[in-house]
């Protein structure tokens, strides 16, 4: 899958292999539906910008209140599950998104 960490700098970057978790899911027959928005560079770019923002995807919003951001680096994963668009999602705990 293309992996850009929400940044234009990595556009077109393709990782050489699946992560351990993704390879286990595929082996078990899981179908991957896609990738979700995340804070640019997994929220490690700066402390002075809105969580859930990336140059590639723009500002991710809460599934229930469009005036707030969902917070955390894996914000798109949380929003997708919260909105019942997908049954489960994978995310990383980088800056509070797994709380």
Predicted regions and their residues:
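Conserved catalytic cores of soluble enzyme domains
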Residues: 99
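Gly/Ser-rich catalytic/binding loops embedded in alpha/beta enzyme cores
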Residues: 1-95
